């Protein structure tokens, strides 16, 4: 699925899950979102839940074709975003991981390595040039964990928002979007409402 001419959706749908984070009923499943930005350099945005490693890696390979990704941007360290960082780096050892300093510290605890020799640490205002696309990074602590960054693609005017603007439900199910987005907001990020409001009002 192409989001724009250069941005491809490579996430997966989970129809086996019944409780998200062990407490929120998700009768229509969940989607774990990941994207490929196809430019002079290829950036992969986030990974997916560990139960979908092979499907996701197949999606990455299909999106990249004969090429290999140059960057993996890890915006959030919750497992539904980061569980396949190690698997990705095993397949693409020449790729660089782009993430916040706090996220790399968490990787050492989660995975036993912080990928020091393949790490690009980014902070508020940093940019990554892919060619036509420039990614700008915005610090978004506590949306939903303290290490979170979100990423803005100025070429296509697309915000990759981590947990900030999510919803419950798999993407291959027809349902009322607003209802599940509202339920997700109040269940997952409502306690950080001020930070979400600040994030959405950024220029």
Name these PLM-found stretches:
Residues 77-82, 104-106, 144-145, 166-169:
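Active-site environment of divalent metal-dependent phosphoester hydrolases
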Residues 2-64, 150-153, 157-161:
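Conserved beta-strand hairpin/beta-sheet module of binuclear metal-dependent hydrolase folds
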Residues 2-5, 99-203:
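Metallo-beta-lactamase
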Residues 43-46, 70-74, 136-137:
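Short catalytic-loop micro-motif centered on adjacent basic/acidic residues
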Residues 87, 109-112, 170-174:
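Short acidic, glycine/serine/threonine-rich loops at helix termini
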Residues 40-41, 68-69, 93-94, 116-117, ...:
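Short coil/turn connectors at secondary-structure junctions
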Residues 40, 51-98:
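Active-site metal-binding motif and surrounding structural segment of the metallo-beta-lactamase
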């Amino acid at each position: 699925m192409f989001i724009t001419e250069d941005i491809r959706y490579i996430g997966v749908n989970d129809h086996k899950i019944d409780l998200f984070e062990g407490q929120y009923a998700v009768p229509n499943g969940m989607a774990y979102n990941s994207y490929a930005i196809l430019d002079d350099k290829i950036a992969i945005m986030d990974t997916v839940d560990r139960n979908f490693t092979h499907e996701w890696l197949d999606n990455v390979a299909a999106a990249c074709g004969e090429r290999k990704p140059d960057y993996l941007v890890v915006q959030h360290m919750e497992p539904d975003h980061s569980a396949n960082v190690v698997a990705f780096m095993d397949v693409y050892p020449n790729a660089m991981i782009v993430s916040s300093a706090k996220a790399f510290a968490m990787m050492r605890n989660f995975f036993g390595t912080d990928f020091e020799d393949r790490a690009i640490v980014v902070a508020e205002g940093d940019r990554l040039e892919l060619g036509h696309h420039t990614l700008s990074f915005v610090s978004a602590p506590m949306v939903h964990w303290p290490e979170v960054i979100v990423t803005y693609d100025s070429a296509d005017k697309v915000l990759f928002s981590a947990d900030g603007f999510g919803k419950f439900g798999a993407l291959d199910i027809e349902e009322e979007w607003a209802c599940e987005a509202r339920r997700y907001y109040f269940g997952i990020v409502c306690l950080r409402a001020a930070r979400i409001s600040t994030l959405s009002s950024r220029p």
